[in-house]
């Protein structure tokens, strides 16, 4: 599959360009996002001061990639854009590394006034043979984790880690409801919550997913909207409109709802505002996580034996199959694409 060796001229007189295999957004289609997904040769990363190029060994899919194909966070003038936020691989010195995909958090490698972005919003992503990121964004991969496992952590698992431990403020023994078991963030929240000594409740429309949630450590898994045996201290919300009312109603007085996504839409029919103010509930938005939190998450997984839940591993040239499965909602855990 490798195309990174030769150098190809584009046209007579143009500079020669090194190319590589990549999976990319060629067009924006809000209704049929996969219509814009293509794979083939793209220019390899160019050398840039303060940036490093990593050879990708594994990269994982996120709903962010589907949203990008719909044009959310990805402007037409940035196309074609190589997709993929997450990756683990080997840097220019042969070190095994993991990428933190929030660019501009620190100003490293970008201008001081450049707003924060996630890979694929401004800069080419990880579904390729190579990716270039600010050197500051590269972390050592713990030897205990495989490339496939490590590639699951920087987006969905980091998001869940920040939601639980930074924004929900939960402690061992507290209770938490995770909506939408099966999704990448939700699955991570179940596993991390169990490992941290929380009582985890989960929901899913799918009986097989509810069963898997129990196997991962949830004390109870119910259908969306079902009454829980107790009011919970916190809710981890990524589904959005379809589960919002249930999330608010499931909280104890003074409880915290942390939301990082809205895969079912962002306009719930009932905002439950009266309940929010009367019970003094906290609603906290959460996006991704910091480099320090990713370091903590990597160490946590290495030390505890906690591992990401991987639904399927596919070679990168079969990325479309992975996108189709993610769009259908049939996943439990992460889909990982492997390089070579």
Language-model features, listed with the residues they occupy:
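Short N-terminal strand-loop motif that marks the start
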Residues: 1-87, 133, 340
């Amino acid at each position: 599959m490798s195309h990174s060796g030769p150098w190809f001229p584009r046209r007579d007189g143009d500079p020669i360009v090194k190319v590589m295999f990549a999976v990319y957004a060629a067009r924006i289609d809000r209704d049929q996002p996969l219509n814009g997904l293509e794979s083939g040769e793209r220019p390899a990363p160019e050398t840039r001061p303060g940036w490093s190029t990593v050879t990708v060994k594994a990269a994982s899919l996120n709903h962010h990639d589907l949203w990008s194909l719909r044009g959310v966070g990805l402007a037409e003038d940035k196309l074609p854009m190589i997709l993929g936020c997450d990756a683990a691989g080997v840097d220019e010195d042969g070190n095994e590394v993991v990428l933190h995909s929030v660019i501009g958090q620190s100003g490293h490698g970008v201008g001081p006034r450049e707003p924060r972005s996630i890979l694929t919003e401004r800069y080419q992503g990880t579904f390729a043979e190579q990716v270039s990121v600010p050197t500051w964004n590269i972390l050592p991969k713990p030897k205990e984790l495989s490339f496939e496992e490590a590639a699951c952590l920087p987006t969905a698992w980091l998001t869940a880690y920040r939601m639980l431990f930074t924004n929900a403020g939960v402690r061992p023994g507290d209770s938490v409801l995770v909506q939408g078991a099966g999704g990448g963030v939700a699955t991570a929240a179940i596993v991390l919550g169990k490992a941290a000594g929380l009582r985890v409740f989960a929901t899913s429309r799918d009986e097989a997913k509810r069963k898997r949630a129990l196997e991962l450590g949830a004390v109870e898994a119910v259908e969306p909207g079902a009454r829980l045996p107790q009011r919970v201290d916190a809710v981890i919300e990524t589904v959005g409109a379809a589960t919002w009312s249930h999330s608010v109603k499931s909280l104890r007085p003074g409880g915290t709802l942390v939301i990082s996504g809205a895969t079912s839409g962002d306009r719930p029919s009932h905002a439950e505002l009266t309940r929010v103010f009367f019970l003094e509930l906290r609603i906290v938005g959460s996006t991704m996580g910091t480099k320090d939190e990713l370091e903590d998450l990597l160490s946590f997984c290495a030390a505890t034996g906690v591992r990401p839940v991987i639904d399927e591993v596919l070679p990168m040239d079969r990325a479309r199959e992975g996108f189709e499965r993610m769009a259908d909602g049939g996943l439990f855990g992460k889909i990982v694409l492997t390089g070579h």
